[in-house]
């Protein structure tokens, strides 16, 4: 079993490094160079995003023996997932599903009337999101080189 919790402010850069590592392995091959640069600029190198994380609007993460192995982040409104990555060697072992279940329970403690969570799924992540109950809301789109399908999870 993995430890699942919100990351601490001193773990933000580790989480972003994990996101970039997994993005480059699994997402980048399907993206134009513009999309790769957009991801880096908007997430990994975004000082505002990093600052918010360090102030407590942090991703949730799974740890195996103290090592961060997966993350799921949300915007501060806690209604939209903005990143989800699991290290390659932990794919298909329930890591991301466990993080999602934990964050959903955590959110519902504070917002019991929340009725949906949204995200923009990458092509690589779409089968996972379908598996845990997200439904596509439109066809795949591309903005600034980032390919995504808007999806919604109804609670």
Q: Which sequence ranges carry the predicted segments?
A:
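Conserved N-terminal entry element of GNAT/NAT acetyltransferase domains
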Residues: 1-13, 154
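Acetyl-CoA-dependent GNAT
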Residues: 9, 17-83, 87-88, 100-102, ...
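Short alpha-helical
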Residues: 10, 14, 76, 123-127
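Short, well-ordered beta-strand micro-motif
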Residues: 61-63, 150-154
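Conserved glycine-rich acetyl-CoA-binding loop
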Residues: 67, 83, 87-101, 122-127, ...
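Conserved GNAT acetyl-CoA-binding A-motif
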Residues: 107-121
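Conserved catalytic-core motifs of GNAT/GCN5-like acyltransferases
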Residues: 118-120, 130, 135-150
């Amino acid at each position: 079993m993995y430890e699942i919790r919100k990351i601490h402010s001193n773990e933000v850069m580790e989480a972003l490094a994990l996101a970039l590592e997994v993005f480059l392995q699994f997402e980048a091959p399907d993206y134009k160079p513009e999309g790769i640069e957009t991801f880096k600029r908007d997430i990994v190198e975004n000082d505002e995003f990093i600052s918010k994380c360090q102030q407590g609007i942090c991703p949730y993460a799974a740890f195996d023996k103290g090592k961060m192995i997966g993350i799921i982040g949300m915007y501060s409104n806690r209604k939209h997932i903005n990143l989800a990555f699991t290290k390659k060697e932990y794919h298909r072992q329930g890591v991301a599903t466990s993080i999602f279940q934990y964050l959903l329970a955590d959110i519902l403690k504070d917002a019991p009337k929340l009725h949906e969570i949204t995200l923009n799924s990458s092509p690589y992540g779409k089968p996972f999101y379908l598996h845990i109950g997200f439904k596509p809301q439109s066809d795949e789109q591309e903005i600034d080189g980032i390919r995504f399908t808007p999806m919604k999870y109804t609670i």
